[in-house]
From Swiss-Prot:
InterPro entries: SASP_SspK. Residues 39-49 have a biased composition (Basic and acidic residues). The gene is sspK. This is Small, acid-soluble spore protein K. Residues 1-49 are annotated as: Disordered.
Amino acid sequence: MRNKAKGFPNQVNHKFEGEPGATDAYASKRPNGETNTRPQERMRASGKR
């Protein structure tokens, strides 16, 4: 039986709710297109937010 027949909520509408995704501060590329140096520090900082 499919979700529609079971009465589950439509999950497409919930896709953009909640916390936003990664911000520019934790992006892998700089605005000029270069790759950020020290990716381990960036990933560690992203996990602590």
